[in-house]
């Protein structure tokens, strides 16, 4: 209601965006100020819920979501393929320097519960068979997986493109140049025809400029 009154009084355009949490915190929000400076007349409402990963939320003007295949009957643009790489905390690496040589034997593994086979797929693509871990920690969201690795709870598979700031800051250490190319991609999605709206067109152009083929 307040936003509606503001729009009526000041002519501000409203844009409702839904983004999965890790993408929002690591990519979108750090760069959003440049969009706001360029389009000060667009008010953005960002929802970071993660309950509709495989569909475009009905209440959203624009969403950024992981899809295995491009959704039909929507205006879609692929941003980049999801790639997973092994990572752990500097402290865990110091305790187990063999990790950098690919030896994960006897170490705790952190598993994203929505991707239960990711470690198996990574092992097959990397070459050596994955040794039995000392324990397995399962977590519901990708950002909680990364946080657990940051806290030294184990070795995790984290999204390569979304974790670059953690690697640069030294809070996570990438353990290998190898990465697992998944079958999923991040897509920018809007309803058919909404791309003609000025605020949707502006946001899409900016997103593609910042994150296309990241």
Feature map (PLM): residue ranges:
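Alpha-helical linker/hinge and terminal dimerization helices associated
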Residues: 1-9
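Central regulatory/effector-binding core of bacterial HTH transcription factors
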Residues: 11-72
């Amino acid at each position: 209601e307040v936003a509606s009154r503001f729009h009526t009084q000041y002519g501000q355009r409203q844009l409702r965006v839904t983004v999965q949490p890790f993408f929002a915190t690591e990519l979108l929000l750090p760069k959003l100020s440049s969009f706001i400076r360029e389009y000060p007349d667009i008010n953005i409402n960002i929802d970071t819920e993660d309950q509709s990963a495989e569909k475009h939320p009905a209440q959203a003007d624009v969403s950024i979501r992981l899809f295995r295949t491009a959704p039909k009957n929507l205006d879609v643009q692929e941003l980049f393929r999801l790639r997973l790489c092994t990572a752990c905390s500097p402290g865990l690496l110091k305790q187990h320097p063999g990790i950098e040589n690919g030896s994960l034997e006897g170490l705790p593994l952190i598993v994203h519960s929505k991707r239960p086979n990711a470690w198996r797929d990574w092992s097959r693509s990397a070459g050596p068979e994955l040794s039995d871990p000392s324990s397995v920690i399962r977590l519901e969201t990708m950002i909680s997986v990364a946080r657990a690795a940051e806290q030294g709870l184990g070795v995790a598979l984290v999204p390569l493109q979304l974790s670059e700031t953690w690697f640069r800051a030294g809070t996570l250490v990438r353990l290998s140049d190898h990465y697992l190319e998944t079958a999923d991609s991040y897509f920018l999605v809007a309803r058919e025809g909404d791309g003609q709206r000025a605020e949707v067109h502006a946001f899409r152009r900016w997103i593609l400029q910042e994150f296309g083929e990241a």
